[in-house]
Amino acid sequence: KLLRWYGIDRNSPRKDFRCEENIEEYGYKFHMNDIAAVIGIEQLKYVNDLVSKHINNAKFYDDQLKNLSKITLLPRSDEAISASWLYTIHVDGRDEFMNYMSKNNVMTSKVHERNDIHDCFSEFRSKVPGVDSFCSSQVSIPVGWWLTSDQLNYIVNLIKEF
């Protein structure tokens, strides 16, 4: 069997996109072809507008989600501009939050976990309590260019009600 998509079996059921399954053998992500390259080149015409929408959506969240008791926003540097591909927050009761958002038709994801928790990287397991602490409460919420103002407000209101 060919290993694809970093070694993740995409056919096995899971709650979160890529954070629950043990990866026994690492794989690679080599699926760019000429057609994908042409589509990517064509999309460059729109990249500034799309990234601006991500950034503006993140700023909206920054403003609306600050000072909530169960939510901690990630610090932002004044010296850097994030493209806001993800909008990650820390949530007290993260797993309950993810279930709550799912029941209200909003997808959330942990997106990433420590690599050394998987068998294929077991020889590199280390004690990193700061990373463990970060991973225990972090979750990403939708921030993409495709979100409407109504959808952003819906997400914010759900979070405030949690």
Model region roles, listed by residue range:
Residues 1-162:
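PLP-dependent aminotransferase class I/II
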